[in-house]
């Protein structure tokens, strides 16, 4: 077998891991983000630690990126233990901050909590959603290279037909995250007709057409390894995003924003019925001729084309989630209720997933069936609830330390009884503070980070024999690869540059 065939076989015919293990792995970065915020407060105001852009970058890289690299490689069998360790570290940091607090120093704990619950959280964007999207981007960047090394567990790679591998979450999670911040949710198009909004949406996808065609041409011209049952012969991630964006833009013109959940459920159920009671499933698996040939546009790309329906449903679920999370809430207690609600819905979806897998069909990324949609939405909501909870805990730590500033976190506003001058000072202090933050940098240039990671992955695969690389060199390559990618994005953010293609 050629090197290309060996690499294709290495990522083929896999069955994935348990839903629980994937969920534990997804929640792990949320707790790392909490620890990072608590560590910043602890070091800034209790240890007189000097924060320059270099020290902040190294702190972010070590606390946010390195643990995820290790989790996906050498410590992949100890995800639960890693979660518990990070939670305990966070609890210790919070304990230290509380007992060295500069605000409410001599006030009983009950009154401290009562005062905190009356605080408002001001934010031009929701840090939990920002962190959700960044986590998905970082996870994808690590996984697309790590999967070609033996150190990366095969159970985390994409499954062949049925199952839940960690990488199976990637595209669905990306689409869910994009939906939460889509223009319709952010009320970006507030003027003009609905068809004018559709025209703007059509215009916004042309860079993706360029990127999708560019990737197709490059992959075919250099003979790079492919997994044809993932999307098909010509289809790729960018084409899926294009079709999903076009269909959902039309749906959001027809249906009210707050009814997106009804659209999502309707599409998913009807699509599953079509899979069960029409030849659609057979077409996805074996083509129109029943022999699995790749002749003709539909047969060549049947997985990518048909599975788009499932991703449309995921997008609409993301729109509904964004609509709910971006609602204005007066006090911290309202955000606690919202977090509990998101968590409860996530649990409900996991229960529904179990029922569907037992009685209807198992999770299949290849078909993006009902179970897959339930799994992606449930996992996304669970991650989001962990991030919301982390944000609330971090806000409590900031509340205890006067002048505490943490990039990419909620800004605190005193209650209505506090004078307006002190309120504005709190917000302005955070606005005027330089943001040395890897999360903010990655969020600013997410698409460029994804492209940079893909190019670097391709170059490494063409120059390194990944199939026969030991554990030490695998970790070295992955660490250098992520360090270089993150540093480029970080420097761009320091210079105030956003790389756009339109």
Swiss-Prot record:
The membrane-topology field of this record reads:
Multi-pass membrane protein
State its Enzyme Commission number(s).
Answer: 2.3.-.-
- Annotated membrane-spanning segments are 22-42, 49-71, 75-97, 132-152, 161-181, 202-222, 237-257, 260-280, 305-325, 338-358, 374-394, 447-467, 472-492
What does the record give as its pathway? Glycolipid biosynthesis; glycosylphosphatidylinositol-anchor biosynthesis
**What InterPro entries does the annotation carry?**
PIGW/GWT1 (IPR009447)
Main location group: endoplasmic reticulum
Q: Which GO terms describe its biological process?
A: GPI anchor biosynthetic process; protein localization to plasma membrane
Q: Which GO MF term does the entry hold, naming one?
A: glucosaminyl-phosphatidylinositol O-acyltransferase activity
Q: Where in the cell is it found?
A: Endoplasmic reticulum membrane
Glycosylation, residue list: 13
Give the keywords, sorted.
Answer: Acyltransferase, Endoplasmic reticulum, Glycoprotein, GPI-anchor biosynthesis, Membrane, Phosphoprotein, Transferase, Transmembrane, Transmembrane helix
Q: Which domain of life is it from?
A: Eukaryota
Q: Which GO terms describe its cellular component?
A: endoplasmic reticulum membrane
Job description of the protein: Acyltransferase that catalyzes the acyl transfer from an acyl-CoA at the 2-OH position of the inositol ring of glucosaminyl phosphatidylinositol (GlcN-PI) to generate glucosaminyl acyl phosphatidylinositol (GlcN-(acyl)PI) and participates in the fourth step of GPI-anchor biosynthesis. Required for the transport of GPI-anchored proteins to the plasma membrane. Acetylation during GPI-anchor biosynthesis is not essential for the subsequent mannosylation and is usually removed soon after the attachment of GPIs to proteins.
Similarity remark: Belongs to the PIGW family.
Q: What name does the UniProt record give this protein?
A: Glucosaminyl-phosphatidylinositol-acyltransferase PIGW
Source organism phylogeny: Eukaryota, Metazoa, Chordata, Craniata, Vertebrata
């Amino acid at each position: 077998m050629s090197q290309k065939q060996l690499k294709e076989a290495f990522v083929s015919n896999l069955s994935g891991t348990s839903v629980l293990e994937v969920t534990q792995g997804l929640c792990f970065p949320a707790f790392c983000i909490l620890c990072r915020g608590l560590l910043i407060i602890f070091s800034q105001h209790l240890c007189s630690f000097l924060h320059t852009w270099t020290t902040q970058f190294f702190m972010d890289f070590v606390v946010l990126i390195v643990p995820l690299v290790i989790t996906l490689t050498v410590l992949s069998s100890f995800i639960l233990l890693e979660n518990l360790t990070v939670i305990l570290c966070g609890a210790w940091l919070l304990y230290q901050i509380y007992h060295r607090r500069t605000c409410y120093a001599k006030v009983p704990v009950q009154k401290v909590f009562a005062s905190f619950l009356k605080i408002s959280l001001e934010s031009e964007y929701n840090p939990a959603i920002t962190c959700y999207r960044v986590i998905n981007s970082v996870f994808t960047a690590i996984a697309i290279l790590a999967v070609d090394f033996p150190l990366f567990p095969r159970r985390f790679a994409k499954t062949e037909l049925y199952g839940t591998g960690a990488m199976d979450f990637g595209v669905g999670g990306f689409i869910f995250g994009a939906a939460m911040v889509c223009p319709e949710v952010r009320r970006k198009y507030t003027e003009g007709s609905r068809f004018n909004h559709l025209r703007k949406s059509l215009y916004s996808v042309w860079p993706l057409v360029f990127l999708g065609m560019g990737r197709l041409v490059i992959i075919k011209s250099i003979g790079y390894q492919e997994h044809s049952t993932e999307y098909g012969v010509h289809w790729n991630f960018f084409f899926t995003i294009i079709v999903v964006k076009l269909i959902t833009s039309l749906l959001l013109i027809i249906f009210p924003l707050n009814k997106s959940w009804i659209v999502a459920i309707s599409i998913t159920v009807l699509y599953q019925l079509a899979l069960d009671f029409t030849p659609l499933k057979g077409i996805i698996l074996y083509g129109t001729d029943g022999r699995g040939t790749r002749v003709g546009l539909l047969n060549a790309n049947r997985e990518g084309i048909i599975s788009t329906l499932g991703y449309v449903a995921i997008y609409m679920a993301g729109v509904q989630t964004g609509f709910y999370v971006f609602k204005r809430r007066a006090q911290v207690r309202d955000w606690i209720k919202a977090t509990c609600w998101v968590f409860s819905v996530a649990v409900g979806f996991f229960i529904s997933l179990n029922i569907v897998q037992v009685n209807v069909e198992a999770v299949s990324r290849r078909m993006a069936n009902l179970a897959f949609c339930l799994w992606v939405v449930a996992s996304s909501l669970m991650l989001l609830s962990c991030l919301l909870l982390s944000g609330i805990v971090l806000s409590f730590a900031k509340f205890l330390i006067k002048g505490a500033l943490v990039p990419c976190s909620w800004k605190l506003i005193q209650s209505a009884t506090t004078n307006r001058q002190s309120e504005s000072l709190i917000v302005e202090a955070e606005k005027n503070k330089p943001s040395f933050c890897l999360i903010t940098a990655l969020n600013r240039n997410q698409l460029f980070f994804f492209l940079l990671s893909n190019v670097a992955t391709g170059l490494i695969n063409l120059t390194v024999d990944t199939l026969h690389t030991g554990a030490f060199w695998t970790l070295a390559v992955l660490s250098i690869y992520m360090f270089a990618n993150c540093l480029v994005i970080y420097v761009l953010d320091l210079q105030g540059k956003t790389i756009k293609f339109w």
